[in-house]
């Protein structure tokens, strides 16, 4: 067994993980599939059945789990609506403390709980929370919550706010980094992470999914640093959400204080996470769409990449080495461990899922960008697999995926020259605008050194000033 644990950090990331596990759910009926890579099997010897819970650790702010109680499917007393319907002494003697307005289950989740054969169609109104349409039941050890920060359902795109007062937000890299180190590190490693690790026979690695533009980037950076210190021999693939910023939109850097802060967060988080990860995937976060819809599109890429590690038992003996996270890392980096930003993220004819494709060319960059390495993930034609060509099982669609993204035949991921445009642009920006930051020179050095990893051929030394 080669288990992979998904560590999902932020509300947006939890939507992506929900979509991913919803797409895995149909595979549970296929005995040939190695479902225990991403799912933990629980065997009932009496009924001779097996149930699965996701190998996942989900981080969210308070209220981010919506109507879902941590022990809801373990103990009914964890869910307020159950108390309402109960009769007898338990309901009469129960003492309830209400700290916020109750979040009701969505019609979709109610239909799932009732075993309905026909489920309501997903839309923006009934899928505000990832728990509104989650098909699998999580183990209580999967849930982790920021105790002093609250999710605001009315402003989904905003970072969590302190004590639900909507005055101070979780929108700073340093705030997130300090929060994990000072308040959550010991408990997380000793409790929930430890419980998930105990359920693995031969862990091969972690997927880290996080946002980069706010405090979650710093939070994840500190977490990954300690994870690598604790488990240095496993693989780490990080998927970082990037919202459009002043660079991608070609706006003045100081157009607003908030936009400048977002860019500072993104730069620091990208440096920290890419340095500690085996592979780093810069995802585009579309803030104009509801979370369920945008992540329902992005899951085509995420599911395709991870389908490489989750396959047929019949083929396991013949291509087991090629279905490891470490093999994909080697195929994309070819031993150049510092050149690990996977900037080409394409699925079929859909728009690119890479944020870096939205960034303008740097002053003297060439177009198109050179491709250092590229891997194809084939989900239809089933050609023979090779080091750079992976044949996996067909895409299994879920009814929670938008109608516009119901098919997935081939994904192409690669390491290109494009990160140089991004890193050099950021290096110029840091030189000009990080005037009083204590880590200014360190960030400049990191960006300059890292950009060299993505250079190919010769460049014109006559660089005109960047108009930011």
UniProtKB/Swiss-Prot annotation:
It comes from the Eukaryota. Coiled coil: none annotated. It is found in: Mitochondrion. GO terms for biological process: mitochondrion organization. Keywords: Mitochondrion. Its main location: mitochondrion. GO terms for cellular component: mitochondrion. Belongs to the misato family. Involved in the partitioning of the mitochondrial organelle and mitochondrial DNA (mtDNA) inheritance. This is Protein DML1. It comes from Kluyveromyces lactis (strain ATCC 8585 / CBS 2359 / DSM 70799 / NBRC 1267 / NRRL Y-1140 / WM37).
């Amino acid at each position: 067994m080669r288990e992979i644990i998904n560590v999902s950090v932020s509300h947006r990331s939890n939507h992506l993980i929900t979509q991913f596990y919803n797409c895995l759910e149909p595979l549970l009926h296929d005995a040939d599939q190695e479902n225990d890579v991403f799912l933990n099997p629980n065997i009932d010897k009496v009924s001779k059945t097996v149930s699965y819970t996701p190998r996942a650790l989900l981080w969210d702010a308070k209220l981010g789990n919506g109507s879902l109680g941590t022990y809801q499917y373990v103990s009914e007393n964890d869910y307020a609506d159950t108390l309402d319907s109960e009769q007898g002494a338990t309901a009469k003697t129960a003492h309830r403390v209400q700290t916020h307005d109750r979040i009701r289950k969505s019609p979709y989740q109610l239909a799932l709980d009732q075993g309905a054969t026909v489920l309501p169609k997903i839309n923006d109104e009934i899928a505000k929370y990832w728990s509104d349409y989650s098909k699998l039941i999580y183990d209580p050890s999967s849930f982790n919550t920021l105790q002093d920060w609250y999710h605001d359902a009315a402003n989904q795109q905003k970072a969590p706010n302190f004590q639900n007062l909507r005055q101070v937000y979780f929108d700073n890299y340093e705030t997130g980094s300090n929060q994990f180190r000072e308040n959550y590190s010991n408990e997380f490693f000793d409790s929930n992470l430890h419980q998930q690790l105990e359920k693995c026979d031969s862990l091969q690695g972690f997927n880290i999914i996080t946002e980069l533009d706010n405090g979650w980037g710093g939070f994840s950076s500190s977490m990954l640093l300690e994870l690598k210190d604790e488990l240095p021999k496993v693989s780490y693939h990080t998927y970082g959400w990037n919202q459009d910023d002043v660079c991608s939109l070609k706006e003045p850097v100081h157009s607003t204080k908030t936009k400048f802060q977002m860019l500072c967060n993104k730069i620091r988080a990208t440096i920290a996470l890419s340095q500690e990860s085996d592979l780093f995937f810069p995802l585009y976060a579309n803030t104009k769409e509801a979370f369920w819809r945008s992540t329902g599109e992005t899951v085509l890429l995420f599911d395709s990449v991870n389908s490489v590690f989750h396959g047929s038992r019949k083929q396991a003996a013949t291509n087991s080495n090629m279905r490891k996270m470490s093999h994909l890392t080697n195929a994309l980096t070819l031993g150049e461990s510092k050149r690990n930003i996977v900037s080409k993220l394409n699925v079929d004819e859909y728009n690119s899922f890479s944020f870096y494709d939205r960034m303008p060319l740097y002053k003297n960059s060439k177009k198109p960008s050179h491709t250092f390495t590229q891997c194809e993930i084939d989900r239809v034609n089933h050609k023979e697999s090779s080091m750079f060509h992976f044949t996996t099982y067909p895409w299994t669609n879920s009814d929670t995926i938008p109608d516009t993204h119901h098919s997935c035949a081939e994904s192409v991921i690669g390491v290109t020259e494009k990160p140089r445009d991004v890193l050099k642009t950021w290096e110029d920006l840091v030189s000009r605008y990080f005037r009083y930051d204590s880590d200014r020179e360190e960030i400049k050095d990191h960006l300059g050194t890292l950009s060299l990893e993505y250079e190919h051929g010769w460049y014109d030394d006559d660089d005109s000033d960047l108009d930011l």
